[in-house]
């Protein structure tokens, strides 16, 4: 995916993307992979004027992304959008199934519909996209939430293929690192939110997909 010297790169998602960013999305990009990528681009291509914007928001599901898409994404007219969403769509079925104090989980058919609408609106606005699949940093195939998460990841993969989008599969990325001896606890303390090492892995894989010219 080509990124030219005056492009705008926007990171969209939930807490995995947010990582304590400045509310504006531009000044401080948080402690995660968006900041790492912005730093790598700035150091490797100092002559470029690539604007990086972080619009990750903690707790977001696809429902929330849809509700803020115009203001946070389309109005910024990005050239490239990375989207990491779906974890909270699944997680709320497992961590808070009975509470009424937060959004409930998003059924998979609604997830598909929401995600497809997000993709359509962003691409029709002229941006290229990279989808990051939902994941759970747990190698136990019998873990129920992991099983569900992978079903949502399949939806993400299907839509990436349908709309000819770039795809970064995070479950295989983390499982590959664990297979090589990296502990799951090195990658995440709670199996969802990446550690510095986990974010580094994401940032490096995304940088491989960017052809900065």
Predicted regions and their residues:
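Alpha-helical cap/lid subdomain in secreted, periplasmic
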Residues: 2-5, 36-51, 60-213
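Short glycine-rich His-centered loop
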Residues: 2-28
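Basic, amphipathic N-terminal segments that precede the first structured/catalytic domain
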Residues: 17, 57-58
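Conserved SAM-binding motif I beta-strand of class I
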Residues: 54
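Short N-terminal amphipathic alpha-helix/helix-capping patch enriched in small hydrophobics
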Residues: 29-37
């Amino acid at each position: 995916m080509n990124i030219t010297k005056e492009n705008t790169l926007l990171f969209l998602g939930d807490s995995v993307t947010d990582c304590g960013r400045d509310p504006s999305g531009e000044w401080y990009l948080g402690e995660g992979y968006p900041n790492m990528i912005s730093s790598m681009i700035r150091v490797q291509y100092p002559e470029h004027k690539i604007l990086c914007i972080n619009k990750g928001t903690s707790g977001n599901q696809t429902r929330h992304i849809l509700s803020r898409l115009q203001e946070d994404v389309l109005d910024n007219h990005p050239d490239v959008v990375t989207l990491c969403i779906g974890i909270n769509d699944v997680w709320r079925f497992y961590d808070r199934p009975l509470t009424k104090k937060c959004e409930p989980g998003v059924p998979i058919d609604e997830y598909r519909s929401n995600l497809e609408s997000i993709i359509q609106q962003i691409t029709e606005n002229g941006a290229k996209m990279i989808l990051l699949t939902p994941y759970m940093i747990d190698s136990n195939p019998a873990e129920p939430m992991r099983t569900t998460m992978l079903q949502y990841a399949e939806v993400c993969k299907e839509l990436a293929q349908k709309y000819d989008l770039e795809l970064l599969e995070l479950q295989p990325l983390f499982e590959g690192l664990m297979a090589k001896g990296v502990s799951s606890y090195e990658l995440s303390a709670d199996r969802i939110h990446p550690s510095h090492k986990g974010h580094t892995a994401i940032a490096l894989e995304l940088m491989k997909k960017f052809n900065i010219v």
